[in-house]
C-alpha cells in the first residue's frame, strides 16, 4: 500500500462529517476512532462497506456510492491531465478504474488501537506492510513501451487509446510482480474541532 495514498484517503474520508450528536436518552454518542478508521480503510481498499456505513450512519449502498464517486473523481482528475492525447472513452475510464481497484486490493494493513487523550482527540496506530506496486510501475511502463515498439507501434505518437493500452499493461505487470516490504507502524492523529467534528491532523498530511 502506498503510504501517501493511505493518508490521502484518511484525510478525505475522516473529514467527511462525523459529528458527535445527542442520543435519544440525552447522552453523547461515543466516537469509535478505531472502528471508523478501519471502516474507512476497508471501504477504500477492500470494498467492504459495513463498518464504514455504520460509523457514518448511512446505508451500505450509500457508503459504496460515496467511495465510488470519490474514485470516479480521481480517475477524471488524473486523465484530464492527458488532454493532449485526446478523449478517453467511458470504457477506457472504467478499465483504468478497475485497475486502481486491483491495486488497492493489494493493501495490507491492520488497525491496532486508538488512544484517546484528555481533550477527546485520538491517536490511531496502524500496522502497514507496503506494496511495491507503484515503485515498479515506471520500469514496467518502459518495458511495455519497448515491447509495443518492437511490434511496430510508434508510442511517441500515442493517442488516448494507445496510451491506455500501455498504462493498463504496465499496471498489470506491476500487480503480477507485486512484493511487500517490511511491516511498519504509523500513527494517525484524529482530532476534534470546535464543532465536534473529527478530522485527520495537518501534521499527518506532511
Predicted regions and their residues:
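Subset-of-secretome marker
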Residues: 28-206
Amino acid at each position: 500500500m502506498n503510504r501517501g495514498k493511505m493518508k490521502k484517503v484518511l484525510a478525505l474520508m475522516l473529514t467527511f462529517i462525523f459529528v458527535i450528536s445527542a442520543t435519544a436518552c440525552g447522552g453523547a454518542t461515543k466516537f469509535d476512532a478505531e472502528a471508523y478508521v478501519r471502516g474507512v480503510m476497508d471501504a477504500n481498499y477492500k470494498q467492504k462497506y459495513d463498518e464504514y456505513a455504520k460509523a457514518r450512519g448511512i446505508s451500505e449502498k450509500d457508503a459504496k456510492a460515496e467511495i465510488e464517486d470519490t474514485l470516479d473523481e480521481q480517475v477524471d482528475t488524473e486523465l484530464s491531465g492527458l488532454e493532449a492525447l485526446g478523449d478517453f472513452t467511458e470504457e477506457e475510464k472504467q478499465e483504468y478504474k478497475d485497475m486502481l481497484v486491483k491495486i488497492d486490493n493489494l493493501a495490507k494493513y491492520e488497525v491496532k488501537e486508538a488512544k484517546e487523550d484528555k481533550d477527546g482527540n485520538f491517536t490511531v496506530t496502524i500496522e502497514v506492510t507496503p506494496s511495491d506496486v507503484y515503485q515498479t510501475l515506471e520500469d514496467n511502463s518502459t518495458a511495455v513501451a519497448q515491447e509495443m515498439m518492437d511490434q511496430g507501434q510508434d508510442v511517441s505518437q500515442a493517442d488516448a487509446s494507445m496510451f491506455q493500452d500501455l498504462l493498463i499493461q504496465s499496471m498489470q505487470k506491476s500487480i503480477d510482480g507485486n512484493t511487500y516490504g517490511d511491516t511498519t507502524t504509523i500513527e494517525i492523529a484524529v482530532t476534534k474541532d470546535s464543532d465536534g467534528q473529527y478530522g485527520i491532523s495537518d501534521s499527518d498530511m506532511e
